[in-house]
Amino acid sequence: MKWYKIFESAEAAAQQISANTVQTIWVAGKKICIAHTQEGFFAVNDKCPHNGASLGNGYCTKENSIVCPLHRYHFDLKTGRAKSGLGDVVDTYPIEVRADGMYVGFKILTFTLSFKRRE
């Protein structure tokens, strides 16, 4: 997991992203959506898996979902699963609050190539 600092503190994040709202930010070349709910902060991919709309233009609900502005699909902010049960899933990213700030984590993709030496 590679971690990127997105705010100086949880308080700074709360000042920039009001409760029950969402904001789109760029982190390490990825456009992600940060949602601030009663349960805390959550990070998801900004692109709706259903039709590609920006989830940053949507809104979050009291049920801890983010709602796509295009077709009103609801996605669970913890799991990324669509509430409709249609199988669409938005990528979620962990958020950690540390002494020096708030961080979002991205999985590191590694590829291993095996080559056998020909004799």
Kindly give the residue locations of the regions a language model identified.
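Short cysteine clusters
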Residues: 48, 68-71
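Flexible, glycine-rich terminal cap/loop adjacent to redox cofactors
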Residues: 53, 73-74
